[in-house]
């Protein structure tokens, strides 16, 4: 059974912090072969949405308040364990992240920086392209935005 939790940075246990940094490192740095500084100073003001299964973190997003990365709230560091890919967990993770944004900040636009190969996935969740393609840490990205659902 999947256990979902959302916490502020100062509410995370040391084990939770270690697990989310480990998952982000495994996927974004090792698996994607992308050397970058994951610790960017944005974890502290963020909300951290975590999915645990049998005591192991298997999916995670970082939800940033308005004004941290963009004018709008932002969803970032979207990650699922390689063992859980193609199971629908990523879609569930994003749906819960959108719901969390709406609960925390009201029904306002949400922004994210998507890896280009995932553009259609985010479009299926109501996001639209909001800028030109650009390189972030050597990987093609595109800014996307989702208008509030009324």
What are these regions (language model features)?
Residues 115-116, 135-150:
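C-terminal "cap" of GNAT-fold acetyltransferases
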